[in-house]
Swiss-Prot record:
Keywords: Phosphoprotein. This is Glutamate-rich protein 5. The gene is ERICH5. PANTHER family: GLUTAMATE-RICH PROTEIN 5 (PTHR23006:SF0). The lineage of its organism: Eukaryota, Metazoa, Chordata, Craniata, Vertebrata. It comes from Homo sapiens (Human). Residues 44-59, 120-134, 328-359 have a biased composition (Basic and acidic residues). Transmembrane segments: none annotated.
Length: 374
């Protein structure tokens, strides 16, 4: 690195000062070549870095030399600078060659990492030859491996096929050797299927039977749940009908009772009035007639007719009215006794009147009509 940096510095100085002599330029070129040509012990892995730095550092001064070869501000090209271009050409060739060798060396160094090989340019070609031989050997080995691997592929595919075919053949042989067992195995499967079908068929009727049983149970439950309500409703209806009948009967009985009561109340009054009318007439001696009992009989039916207008409706009404009439007659007798102070007996009076009429007929021989006389 020391000579390369000094050469670069000198080249830079020469570009700055165009008045440098040709001898100095030649010396700088020789020094740069000697720097590149000197063998240095270095590792193969480090060659890329060192040579890369050399290339990077060597290229800028060449460009600067090119710039120095361009026309100056005065427009005159110095004659001393022309041989520099010629001298620079072999330098470029050397740098290009070194760059090409350096480009090949880093790849080889990456392929094989080994101990550092000290030596110059003479050692490098031998190492390169060895590396090439080793690379060719590895490539040949890899090709052989590929060539061996390629036939293995179909063979490997064929082996599973052969194994499958062998298995199938073994199975076929077993089947042929034991056809009875195969036949027995098949019916077993069929019998199992039949059994399962039979079991399923039995389960289905059981399910249907269960449904049939459930339906009557539901019906009975519904009937049991509904029957009390229905019975209660029917009983309630019957009781309501009975109540209605009772109400109607009560209504029918009420008018009958009302009819009885006014009739009972009216008949005694009529009887009382008839009796009152009859009694004064009977008391008068001039108005007494032998037909008195007949009149009484005629009057009494008139009073009874008012009470017996509806004998079909109620038969008991007649007896009840007769009892009341008797009671009223007794009351009238008591009233008459209270007024006159004497006890009046209608029966005795009627007998006396009849006897008096008979005596008159015997005397005169004629019937005396009291009514006509009056």
């Amino acid at each position: 690195m020391g000579c390369s940096s000094s050469a670069l510095n000198k080249a830079g100085d020469s570009s700055r000062f165009p008045s440098v002599t040709s001898n100095e330029h030649f010396s700088t070129a020789e020094e740069s070549e000697s720097c590149f040509a000197q063998p240095k012990p270095h590792a193969l892995g480090r060659e890329s870095t060192v040579d890369g730095n050399v290339q990077r550092e060597s290229r800028p001064p060449l460009q600067k030399l090119k710039v120095s070869a361009e026309p100056t501000a005065n427009g005159v090209k110095p004659l001393q600078e022309q041989p520099l271009a010629k001298d620079v050409a072999p330098g470029r060739d050397a740098t290009d060659q070194s760059g090409s060798t350096e480009k090949t060396q880093p790849g080889e160094g990456l392929e094989e990492s080994g101990p550092p090989q000290p030596g110059g340019k003479e050692d490098a070609p031998a190492a390169e030859g060895k590396k090439k031989d080793a690379g060719a050997g590895t490539e040949a080995e890899s090709l052989k491996g590929n060539a061996e691997a390629q036939p293995l592929g179909p063979e490997a595919k064929g082996q599973p096929l052969q194994a499958a075919v062998e298995k199938d053949s073994l199975r076929a042989v077993e089947v042929t050797e034991n056809p009875q067992t195969a036949a027995e195995m098949k019916p077993l499967g069929t019998t199992e299927n039949v059994l399962t079908l039979q079991i399923a068929g039995e389960l289905q009727p059981q399910g249907t039977v269960g449904k049939d049983e459930q339906a009557p149970l539901l019906e009975t439950i519904s009937k049991e749940n509904e029957s009390p309500e229905i019975l209660e409703g029917s009983q309630f209806v019957e009781t309501a009908e009975e109540q209605q009948l009772q109400a109607t009967l009560g209504k029918e009985e009420q008018p009958q009772l009302l009819e009885r009561i006014p009739k009972e109340n009216v008949t005694p009054e009529v009887l009382d009035r008839s009796q009152l009318v009859e009694k004064p007439v009977m008391n008068d001696p001039f108005h007494k007639t032998p037909e008195g009992p007949g009149n009484m009989e005629q009057i009494q039916p008139e009073g009874i007719v008012g009470s017996m207008e509806h004998p079909a409706r109620n038969v008991e009404a007649g007896a009840y009215v007769e009892m009341i009439r008797n009671i009223h007659t007794n009351e009238e007798d008591q009233r008459i006794e209270g007024e006159t102070g004497e006890k009046v007996e209608t029966d005795m009076e009627n007998e006396k009147v009849s006897e008096g009429a008979e005596t008159k007929e015997e005397e005169t021989g004629e019937v005396v009509d009291l009514s006509a006389a009056t």
